[in-house]
């Protein structure tokens, strides 16, 4: 089943400040800006600017499970608010998505919005030339594929496992490359010593390190 986002979540604009933010380390409210979300769509609350907002109404505050949508930029992806966010607000031009958790899980909605197919669809609907923008109205009408909650959770779990596997493979590949580079360098150095040995008449004794390096390289590959 496909439904418009507006039927399963509330979409609202981030908080608009009338003047430049004045950070206060002792402030009672954390402010989330676009720069606080990295390329992997992860929010880093430890580095948030803080301000004093004594008259802030509670409905502006973020909750666990809210999605923070990048309405402008190269990608129009979403980050998920986790536990322990405390008193925090989202600034404009970002959009806040608050899912109806009786219908859709926040993690599934984030996965769906960030999926390459959805991102391609949003890119086609973005307005502007130099800076692309997705408006609240466009986002509200985004069609969301809505499987049962149990299936949503399974999809998220599988996607996370796949991401973890990919990260592990990339780490192993990087280590293998580093090992190969060390072996190649050692082979080159041993070959140089072998040549120097030949020059002074050491002959076969100097060839052994180079041979061992070459054999070790063959086994590694």
Stretches with model-predicted labels:
Residues 56-57, 84, 129:
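A structural connector/turn signal
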Residues 71-112:
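A short beta-sheet element
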Residues 22-29, 48-49, 60-62, 80-92:
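Short, surface-exposed loop/turn microsegments at beta-strand edges and helix-strand junctions
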Residues 6-20, 37-64:
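Sequence-specific dsDNA recognition surfaces
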Residues 88-93, 128-153:
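A short glycine-rich beta-alpha junction/loop motif
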Residues 30-33, 62, 67-70:
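Short hydrophobic-aromatic micro-motifs
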Residues 106-125:
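Glycine- and charge-enriched low-complexity intrinsically disordered segments
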